Amino acid sequence: MYKLLDTITGPADLKNIPREELPGLADEIRRFLIETVSQTGGHLASNLGAVELSVALHYCFDSPADKLIWDVGHQAYTHKILTGRRESFHTQRQYKGISGFPKRSESPHDAFGAGHSSTSISAGLGMAAAQDLKGSGSRAIAVIGDGSLTGGMAYEALNQAGHLKKNLIVVLNDNEMSISQNVGAFSSFVSRKMTGSDFRKLKKEMQGLLENIPAIGKDILHFARRAENSLKGFLTPGMLFEALGFDYIGPIPGHDLPQLLEVFENVKGLEGPVLVHVMTTKGKGYQPAEENPAAFHGVGPFDVATGKTTGGKPGAASYTGVFGATLVKLAEEDEKIIAITAAMPDGTGLTPFAKRFPERFFDVGIAEQHALTFAAGLAADGFRPVTAIYSTFLQRAYDQVFHDVCLQKLPVTMALDRGGLVGDDGPTHHGTFDLSYLRHLPEMTLMAPKDENELQHMLKTAIYAGRPVALRYPRGAGYGLPLDQTIQSLEIGRGELLTEGDDVAIVAIGSTVYPAQEAAKLLEARGIRATVVNARFVKPLDRELILGAARRTGCIVTVEENALQGGFGSAVLELLADEGMTDVRAKRIGIPDRFIEQGPQPQLRKDLGLDGAGIAATVEAFLTAKGQAALSLVK
């Protein structure tokens, strides 16, 4: 089916293919990617643009001795295919399948794990320093997209790399035209020649000769360097990288394999940090993806002939969609409401806001730290900023939440999308730690809705709370409930009593409330009567409601889609302990102390006992356990 690709089980096989046949291999890989991702879903457009680049890197370097580090991982599919995972590639991002991102435990060729952006240069520099200390002679190559260069960490690494002068190669895969370009035959010619060994040797010899000429030698050398830099600056956009201490090579046409091979072979012999600027086309080779790369950045299963997604049926609105629509509705009535995103306007539901209020919408790029402090600045001057961000990415701005928002008591709303289990993207993207790392911050209010209707009321509550608020909601569709036409503010710190029973109190937060209600029905069929509480707020807790339920039943079970350590259940246990209620038996249900792999959300919840049946089984086993200590901390 694939004449060349079928012969490859690892990088060594790739090197047996004649160079003139490599473009044909790239075509086969591209066809394989389209056919496979159309069935599984995944990050298609970026990977189609990085096929030739990946082939050239593996052809010229020797993985795993040479360390290939892929930033984020959105462009690493060809790398996975060439390193022995083609046969299992149909399982990528699937339950118990291979990861959609580089993963050290998956292959020795995955030198460094990823999923979040802008980390590759730092990791690559560390590996370059390690190779230097070991004297191994291996190279470290960091591949980073131009989008990731909006993250400040990348520049921190570039700055130190230029200072340390280690043998680090940074490949800038520029597929968005966001860096000024000057591509042409002459520029490509100069880039190739400036990396050639003859040119580099001649340059060093001339430098030594000029330095030894009495009186005027250094002046001539200084003039020559200025002339070289002027020429390169005229032809290329690399002066920034040169100023940071890198040898800049490029721009190079990223789909021209002969040029890529020549440049990488030359670069292998260079000393010190080098940046190779490669221009690629996102979605290359598949017309629907080339025409609409944003839609094919992360895509579900689709029909190859038309490019249209398959299997999707109209259903309940997503939490993200309800959030975005509600924010627009509130902003219609309040011109002080501002929306901020960190390079995720579509993913966070802010595109409608951006179109309706472009002057009040800010996309700060992949810069979560800046996003929070930028919001704090707006809040300090009287505005009501709402920063929409995936829960997992807020971890990158923790100090800003503390220092710039909470410490100064500024009214910033943090809308945490993808709170809890996210599904196919796995452990790098699950938002299962936010309740733990936010609830102990002074001045923080932390809430989570049970459904999409409650979400809209909580959003208004957060915006007008006059204090720092984190509003956490899950990925995916809601329950298809009708939305109240009038949006109201909720009383902060007030939960909701859903059902009353005398045997056990189940106190749930956010996405676990409906499963808790389902569990109560299953328990009732077994003769166990449960009180069910929708906590609504992790901080402040509804002390009266929770303590009342504990007194009534003498047995309390908390449920959360968050890490058990320091989470919602821990907050409830602290409340019971502080009130001296040592006669109450307690049990926590949530995410255990491990990273959760990828898989469909319903499957993961079932595995973790977070669906209705699982909660009911845990509660029943807890109630019937013998010798259970009061205020048990047993998971």
Curated annotation (Swiss-Prot):
One of its GO terms (molecular function) is 1-deoxy-D-xylulose-5-phosphate synthase activity. Thiamine diphosphate binds at residues 74, 115-117, 147-148, 175, 286, 368. Gene3D superfamilies: 3.40.50.920, 3.40.50.970. Pfam families: DXP_synthase_N, Transket_pyr, Transketolase_C. GO terms for cellular component: cytosol. Keywords: Isoprene biosynthesis, Magnesium, Metal-binding, Thiamine biosynthesis, Thiamine pyrophosphate, Transferase. Mg(2+) binds at residues 146, 175. It comes from the Bacteria. InterPro entries: Dxylulose-5-P_synthase, THDP-binding, Transketo_C/PFOR_II, Transketolase-like_Pyr-bd, Transketolase_C, Transketolase_CS. Its cofactor is Mg(2+); thiamine diphosphate. Pathway: Metabolic intermediate biosynthesis; 1-deoxy-D-xylulose 5-phosphate biosynthesis; 1-deoxy-D-xylulose 5-phosphate from D-glyceraldehyde 3-phosphate and pyruvate: step 1/1. It catalyses: D-glyceraldehyde 3-phosphate + pyruvate + H(+) = 1-deoxy-D-xylulose 5-phosphate + CO2. Belongs to the transketolase family. DXPS subfamily. Catalyzes the acyloin condensation reaction between C atoms 2 and 3 of pyruvate and glyceraldehyde 3-phosphate to yield 1-deoxy-D-xylulose-5-phosphate (DXP). HAMAP family: DXP_synth. Homodimer. This is 1-deoxy-D-xylulose-5-phosphate synthase 2. The lineage of its organism: Bacteria, Pseudomonadati, Thermodesulfobacteriota, Desulfuromonadia, Geobacterales.
